[in-house]
Amino acid sequence: MIPGDIAAALGVRASGTWRPAPAGVGGAPGTYATSLAFRLADASGRVPGEVAAGLAAALEPVPWISAASITRGGYLTVTVTPEALAGLAVRVPAAGAACADSDALRGTELNAPAAADPASAASWDEARRRLAAEITGRLAAAAGAKVKVKDYSERWCHCGLPALAGAVAFAGPGAVRYALARTQPGRQAAIDAAACARNDLGNPFFAVRYAHAHAASVLRWAADLGLDRGLPETFRPDLLCHPGERELLGVLSWLPERAAAAARRRRPDAFARYLEGLAAAWLGCWERCPALPFGGRSAPTDGPQAAARLWLAAAAQTALRTGIGLLGVAAPERLHAAGSGGLYESPG
């Protein structure tokens, strides 16, 4: 989201050039680095450092950008204001299912297979390849590509691998789909059905869905207490200043870029790992600066700070629900972790 905002302020397409700023160059939430100047320099025959200087100068009058600097001969590092980063807490829920959308792949066309039962694949590798192509289609569509979904089932063997069918029967199709989706190309695709069926935070499939359900339960709990986020116009971005909140906002700010990058590289496993990082950021934020009191921990229960934290919970839930859906998996609103000792028990 934020990298797209910066590109829009420059009036250029910069998809595929953004990276988190490296340590030592302001690598904190709200700071972004781009190699855009090198791309533009190649096209124009100019020196990258000169192009980067022009880009930095163009950003000087933008009120929500606090700094733009040049490093390593042409890399542009941009820092947005804390208020701009915190504003994602309102922007993400407002965008809803479109919060992962961008125009990064606008003008691209591709075919993608319709969703199919993973148990019908003749091998683990075939199941992974099929699923990767299906998810890539959804990610590409979110990034602005024109995607034609086609039914290729007549080309596929329908006998199915017994081990795959057994894994689906034991762990469920969602768990198997997620485990295959996060498997890197070239790695053995066979999965441990028992491991991906565990209801604990050590299981990535459970963790991302649990984080979504946890954020949803926070919002339900707040409603039961009569608490309200209020209108977007009353939101106070300056109140989301805790390091845990800023870390979560920093991860949220990359959602459209991570979806587009995974589509471009045909690597849904990279997007699954992004979601796992987002889930961890939300649960870490809740532990360090909860939106509501729990387990003896204090938290504001009314006023603008409580409202700001509830907006952030809504942003986390919206982003997780959207991302999990792009992987073709359901995002439940009620889910409980086994053996969590209360720390991560659903608050409502």
Describe every region a protein language model picked out:
Residues 1-348:
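Non-catalytic interaction-recognition regions
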